[in-house]
Amino acid sequence: MIERIGEFFLKHFIFCLIGLSLFAPLATQATQVKSIDPFDITPYMGRWYEIAKLPNWFQRNCAQNTQATYQLINPAQIQVLNQCQTAHGEMIQALGMARPRANGQPAQLEVRFAPSWLGWLPIVWGDYWVLDLDPQYQLAAVGDPSKKYLWILSRTPQISEASYKALTQRLSLMGFDVSRLEKTTQN
């Protein structure tokens, strides 16, 4: 009797594993992150205000007024200046560099905040993918393919609730957990 129960569970376990392996690629495709195309880097340059973000360790001291400013140095280099205000009112900054990825996808960049002499190390570069962008380059979503990082950026310190909701719905369809987004105070 115990032998038949074990055989029954083993058959069903194998059946479930086969079923999961067949459907797993479909689930991955449904939530695959893709960068936008087409994308023109030149109008993307300038100041962006952080509207919301997924929590991350490197912004743990940022309480409000988070901004990013991008300056095109040459086609292969973009200067990145991130700044925010701490809970004590102090402004902190991080100066970095971005570059296009070698894959030819213009909205897929890599960014580093490590010193330039460490730039040869692949580990210091992080993915920076433009995932959503309005035609006027006024509202953007930036993240990475692992869905660990996500930012909503705007050319203005505030956006309408309707714009925010529409964008978060599109991001949710990409597989991002938008319920974890933290809105950023801008004043």
Q: What is each stretch, according to the model?
A:
Residues 6-9, 26-187:
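A beta-rich soluble binding module of mature secreted/lumenal proteins
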Residues 3-15:
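Bacterial N-terminal signal peptides that target proteins for export
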